[in-house]
Each structure stands twice: as C-alpha cells, then as structure tokens.
Amino acid sequence: SRELALQIDQVFKSMNTPFKAVSCYGGRPAMEEHRTIKGVQPSVIIGTPGRMNDHLSKQNFDADTVTTLVIDEFDKCLEFGFQEEMATVIGQLPNLQRRFLLSATDAEEIPQFTGLDKTIKLNFLNPEEQLTHRLHLYKVLSPEKDKLETLYKLLCTLGSQSTLVFCNHRESVERVGKYLQSQKFQCGIFHGGMEQDDRERSLYKFRNGSCHVLISTDLAARGLDIPEIENVVHYHLPANEDGYIHRNGRTARWEAEGNSYVILHAEETLPGYIADEPEEFILPQVPPKPSLPEYVTLYIGKGKKDKINKIDIVGFLFKKGNLNKDEI
C-alpha cells in the first residue's frame, strides 16, 4: 500500500544509515518524485508496483544499477492481483542478484515471475513465543442484524483505548464512520478509495492519539506499524484465516497485551478458522458517553516559504491560545 511505502521510508531514514532512500506511490504527482530521485540519487527506492513501473518505463532511474529486490507483504500483493505489475517490474531489472519475499504468513507457492528457482526460507518467528497469553479473544452478540448500535456501545465501553475496527468493504467503512459521527463519536476512516491526503491525515491523527478509533478495510491489516493499539474489532469477519491473523496482528505487539472482539448477530456463526470459542463480552445496559481524545491535531498549511517557523507557531499557541508548555 501507499502508506506502507511511506512508513518504510520514514523508518529507514530514522535509522540514520549512510544510504539515502526515496518513496514512490500513487496519489501524488510522479513528476515531483522524479525530481526528488534526480536530486537525491537514492540507494534505496521504496514504491508501490504501479508507481514503480511508471518510473521504470520513463527511465526516471537507471534500472541497470538495481541488484536487490524486496517485495514486502508478498502474499497480499498476489491476493490483490498485482502479479502482472510485479512481473513487469522484475522484467525491467536485468541485473538482479538477490530477491527477497517478505510476509507474516506463508505463501502456498512461489510464482515463476519472481525468478526464484531455489529459495532459502528465513523464519524469524520464535516457536516458543506464544501470542495466546497476550491476545485476549472475545465475542460480542448483537441483538440486531445491523450491528451499528452494538459497535457504538462497545466503543463507548472501551472508552479512550486505541481501537481499530475492520469492515470488509469501503462502503461499510463510510457507513459505520457516518453513523458514529452522528452519535457524536469522534473517529477516523481509512480505505483505498480515499484521497491520499485524507488517508494520511486519518492515520496521523490515529497515531498521535487525537483520534482513538479508526474504521478501516483490510488496507490497515498489513504492514502498518501503529504502536499501542489496544483493541481490534471485527465488525465483519474476514474471508480467511490469514486475514484474521493479520488483523489481530495490529494489537498485542512487542510484548504488549491486546484484545480482539468479534461482533456477531443472531444468524452469524464463528468460521472454522476460529478454533476456540471466544469468551462472551457482556455490554452494559447503559454504556458510558463517548470518550473525547486527550489531544487535538491542528494543521497549519504554511512553512519556510511563507517565513513561518516552529518558534512562530509555538509563540502563537502560547500568546493567543493561552496554552502551557505541557499542553503542546
């Protein structure tokens, strides 16, 4: 996804290596990326398949110098139907010496277009580490087939905890988001049909705590490393076990504990990939009022070109906003 490309770029730069990196993805002008590539001369280019093919076809960087290819979330790329685009990328890189395919779940087979005849499997999972004692599974029963009110009560009960709600379709994400907002519940939405700026703003606010709840499709289930997510809610159940594993993988990360909630109406049953019956989570008859976030994000669309710096902004918040140092 675009967000995963941006996240990898940010993490790579935060490591302070001597190697320069550039991220390339849709939703913004390719010409700006070309200028950045030309000016930076990066050692690492991180990109989505479509945008990478765009730059390769225009010869915006020298494909002959690329010796290493890494495909992150490889199995999901196949599931999303990116085989042709990935094959086209590989076909334009004549001097590849190493190919890495990364995923949290195993692929059934390696397609021929990868050019991998003999593979070496590296497994970084610790077989002795059990997630079950850190991830707590619950089912929440909805008296109505339309589970909106049950979701609302659950989120009110969870209060200010960071919660990621998964729906199976973009339209459902929009519908759930609008309903919660109509109930004065502050939440963000995230799906592939949104404008890139809106997607990034939703993630930014969720990361920094100015939004406790994010409603998303499975776009947020892969790769995105958002720390301290306390709860995952399956408003809709995923189609398969891999989807369930990756969704739950957004919580209980790095030795932390987390909770996974499955909302079921009377006609729904648990799928076969959920082997153990989850404990039922009983909602209170009268849920608490929606919790307000502790922080608010202000977007200031000005910068150095407008002769505005960080000191000006902080001074404005002190003098005009009457804020204290510990409030910023």
List where the protein language model places each region.
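Conserved interdomain hinge at the start of the Helicase C-terminal
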Residues: 133-181, 312, 316
